[in-house]
């Protein structure tokens, strides 16, 4: 009987070995699905945290940046179109030891004013000659940065009075304004 018991034990052990590995093995697909579910959950969590953080920061920032401004304090400037075809003007100043002026001028006229645009194009040579002679008459001290606004006003007035006849320039801007001392 002892042999029968030992054979029974062997059979029981063999049976456990056959059944146990099948229960431990889940398979490739369910394991993969588990990792995919973990990754999707992590992505959802990260997106939720980032969105919540962005919303909190946006609410805090908006209260500091939005200031109501009344109509009387808003500056309303006329929209202008700029004529920039004059190009670069290079000339010497009127000093005893002349400096060099290199300037590029943009002439502002009312938006969609075809007359001004046509007249500026037609008088391009006159404009270049006027600007060259204007800067030749000036000294280095008259062309310092603190006098720039005065220079712009003088140029605008002289162009309107002496160069243009059918239209007017409203604004002068320098896209380049270099005064080189000798």
Curated annotation (Swiss-Prot):
It comes from the Bacteria. Its main location: membrane. It is found in: Cell membrane. The chain crosses the membrane at residues 36-56. InterPro entries: FliL (IPR005503). Keywords: Cell membrane, Chemotaxis, Flagellar rotation, Membrane, Transmembrane, Transmembrane helix. One of its GO terms (cellular component) is plasma membrane. It is a single-pass membrane protein. GO terms for biological process: bacterial-type flagellum-dependent cell motility; chemotaxis. Belongs to the FliL family. Controls the rotational direction of flagella during chemotaxis. This is Flagellar protein FliL. The gene is fliL.
């Amino acid at each position: 009987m002892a042999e029968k018991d030992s054979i029974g034990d062997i059979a029981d052990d063999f049976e456990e070995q056959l059944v146990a590995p099948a229960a431990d093995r889940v398979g490739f697909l369910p394991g993969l699905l588990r990792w995919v579910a973990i990754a999707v959950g992590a992505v959802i969590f990260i997106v939720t945290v980032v969105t919540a953080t962005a919303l909190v920061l946006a609410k805090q920032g908006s209260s500091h940046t939005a200031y109501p401004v009344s109509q009387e304090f808003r500056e309303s400037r006329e929209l202008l179109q700029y004529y920039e075809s004059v190009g670069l003007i290079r000339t010497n100043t009127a000093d005893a030891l002349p400096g060099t002026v290199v300037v590029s001028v943009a002439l502002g006229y009312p938006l969609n004013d075809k007359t001004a645009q046509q007249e500026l194009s037609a008088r391009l040579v006159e404009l270049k000659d006027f600007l060259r002679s204007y800067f030749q008459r000036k000294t280095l001290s008259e062309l310092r940065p603190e006098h720039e606004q005065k220079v712009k006003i003088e140029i605008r007035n002289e162009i309107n009075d002496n160069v243009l006849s059918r239209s007017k320039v409203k604004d002068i801007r320098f896209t380049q304004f270099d005064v080189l001392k000798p």
